[in-house]
């Protein structure tokens, strides 16, 4: 779980960097493409390009296309039709998708994993909910697709590593993830990108480099590596832990307003969802 906890803090910090220095200023598709390219350069010399099971290669490329490519395209498109509170609210359903996809791939139904995911959703909703406007169906559907593809990528990668074991460390087989992400990010930039909204100064370029090298390269790898080391219920819950962490960082570093009672209550509910999942695991073993 240590990988997931580290990346939770990393991504929570990254969310604030995007909000402060990139959102509304730098073209979103260019930002996504830059992150993929920089992360790919990190893994280019690390990746074993020969002697890897072709079905594993294809599977990891699919994971990259789903978990990073399609997810981020849908996320940015949703901002065209939703308010920020609505976007934040509708992304809290990711744990449910994680639990359901894991059950689907393993041809079973795990009540406790789904229950823990729903409790985590409740905790995140307590923190994020701030009312929604009337016309939100299109944005809601876009974000459910983003939630689904992000969840599917994690669960699929976990399954691929288990199904195709190798003496190679995971870092030598992960570069294919960014190849798959590039197959989505590059066409998205060519079709929807605005070349007039490129980074304007050293600060924005610096944030993009930081996002590509740390949040994307290290973050995506460690998140997926961490996913292989925990059960589906824990993975589902961890997908919402960034909510209180992100708001806390926003309060402490950027001095933004946060509803501390709601933050504390929602965070406690998310932590309680981990207990629900552990309770379920004890019941299954018994």
Curated annotation (Swiss-Prot):
Topology versus the membrane: Multi-pass membrane protein
Transmembrane segment boundaries: 4-24, 26-46, 56-76, 81-101, 109-129, 136-156, 174-194, 203-223, 234-254, 258-280
Compartment(s) where it occurs, according to its Swiss-Prot or TrEMBL record: Cell inner membrane
Residue intervals of the EamA domain: 3-128, 139-277
Source organism, top-level taxon: Bacteria
Reaction catalysis annotation: biotin(in) = biotin(out)
InterPro entries: CO/AA/NH_transpt, EamA_dom
UniProtKB keywords: Cell inner membrane, Cell membrane, Membrane, Repeat, Transmembrane, Transmembrane helix, Transport
GO cellular component: membrane; plasma membrane
Similarity annotation: Belongs to the drug/metabolite transporter (DMT) superfamily. 10 TMS drug/metabolite exporter (DME) (TC 2.A.7.3) family.
NCBIfam families in alphabetical order: 2A78
Functional description taken from the UniProt entry: Uptake of biotin.
Name by which UniProt lists this protein: Probable biotin transporter
Source taxonomy: Bacteria, Pseudomonadati, Pseudomonadota, Gammaproteobacteria, Pseudomonadales
């Amino acid at each position: 779980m240590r990988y997931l906890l580290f990346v939770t803090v990393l991504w929570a910090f990254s969310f604030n960097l995007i909000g402060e220095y990139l959102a509304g200023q730098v073209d979103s598709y260019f930002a996504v493409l830059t992150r993929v390219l920089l992360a790919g350069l990190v893994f280019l010399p690390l990746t074993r390009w020969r002697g890897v099971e072709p079905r594993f290669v294809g599977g990891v490329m699919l994971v990259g296309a789903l978990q990073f490519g399609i997810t981020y395209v849908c996320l940015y498109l949703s901002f065209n039709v939703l308010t920020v509170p609505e976007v934040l609210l509708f992304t809290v359903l990711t744990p449910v998708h994680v639990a359901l996809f894991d059950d689907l791939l393993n041809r079973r139904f795990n009540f406790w994993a789904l229950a823990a995911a729903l409790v985590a959703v409740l905790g995140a909703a307590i923190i994020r909910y701030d009312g929604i406007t009337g016309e939100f169906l299109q944005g809601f559907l876009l974000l459910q697709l983003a939630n689904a593809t992000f969840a599917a990528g994690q669960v699929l990668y976990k399954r691929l590593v288990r199904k195709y074991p190798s003496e190679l460390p995971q870092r030598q087989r992960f570069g294919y993830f960014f190849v798959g992400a590039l197959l989505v990010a590059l066409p998205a930039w060519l079709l929807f990108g605005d070349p007039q909204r490129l980074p304007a100064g050293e600060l924005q370029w610096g944030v993009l480099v930081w996002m590509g090298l740390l949040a994307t390269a290290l973050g995506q790898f460690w998140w997926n590596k961490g996913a292989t080391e925990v059960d589906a219920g824990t993975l589902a819950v961890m997908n919402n832990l960034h909510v209180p962490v992100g708001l806390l960082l926003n309060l402490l570093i950027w001095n933004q307003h946060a509803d501390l009672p709601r933050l504390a209550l929602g965070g406690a509910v998310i932590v309680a969802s981990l207990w629900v999942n552990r309770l379920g695991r004890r019941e299954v073993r018994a």
